[in-house]
Swiss-Prot record:
Pfam families named in the record: Tax
Domain notes: The 48 N-terminal residues contain a non-canonical functional nuclear localization signal (NLS). The PDZ-binding domain mediates binding to human DLG1 and MAGI3. Interaction with other PDZ domain-containing protein induces IL2-independent growth.
UniProt-annotated stretches for the region Interaction with CREBBP/P300: 81-95
High-level lineage: Viruses, Riboviria, Pararnavirae, Artverviricota, Revtraviricetes
Region (Homodimerization): 116-145, 213-248
Span of the annotated motif SH3-binding: 73-80
Region of interest (Interaction with CREB1), residue spans: 2-58
Annotated spans, Interaction with IKBKG: 106-111
Motif (Nuclear export signal): 188-202
Primary location class: host cell
Protein name: Protein Tax-1
Amino acid sequence: MAHFPGFGQSLLFGYPVYVFGDCVQGDWCPISGGLCSARLHRHALLATCPEHQITWDPIDGRVIGSALQFLIPRLPSFPTQRTSKTLKVLTPPITHTTPNIPPSFLQAMRKYSPFRNGYMEPTLGQHLPTLSFPDPGLRPQNLYTLWGGSVVCMYLYQLSPPITWPLLPHVIFCHPGQLGAFLTNVPYKRIEKLLYKISLTTGALIILPEDCLPTTLFQPARAPVTLTAWQNGLLPFHSTLTTPGLIWTFTDGTPMISGPCPKDGQPSLVLQSSSFIFHKFQTKAYHPSFLLSHGLIQYSSFHNLHLLFEEYTNIPISLLFNEKEADDNDHEPQISPGGLEPLSEKHFRETEV
């Protein structure tokens, strides 16, 4: 499988790092090579190991010092609770280049949310302004915006190692019918180009159902629909899920959805959608790195993150796709003789939960 060097093994010291919002949700101590504490460290700008009392920068892996030399205040769960002293510690170095985010982008995000007025308004693809990829070499930039009634994070990542789109996985299970539920009047060719650009940029392996979205730009892997229903299997589709998240797979095959925790005082990652976790830990929630150390999830599934489809509502098509490159006149895919059938209405039905 093609991917950027080092991504499959690690992003820091050979150990996995995953960024969700402004928090590092999983990282392994560079001294022990393991998870020393369930709350090893919480925030992406400074990382600490309470057992070994060291502090390092998870962005580039530079060890800053021990806790005795460089005292870092205990960070609260939410940015709104941070004090001026905390913010001073958390201020990242100024980058030479920052993405130019037009104000109209944020205005469009607030105005054209698909969940505006309490119901889904699938007009996202028509109204969002064009926003191209950020320049390579940038530190990760998080852009917070309103999505319905909640604040979510738009992810803008640099395109070069050591951090190469940590939230975009090696393997993406994609059902274009579910993508079509959020984007209206988007030609099939444009959806294909979007997937192609993601594939080129991230090196991810894109897996599509075998009987939908004929492609001419690239050859994605095809998964037989007869293996399992897409709505209940590889890519669970929950229309009621309001927070963006990622999917890991338990060793028993059950999907596990993660997202930010809504309550104060709890870990900032919540594991949902599987009774398996609650049988083991009752009401507690742990990061997959903790589950990994206890043998509850497979090692491969810890690295091969599967993109939850609501994530596409937080990464608009205009973010990943240049408007000029789209051929909006090409509404029908080119099908070679004896090729696959074009998408039918059955692929664009919403899934009931």
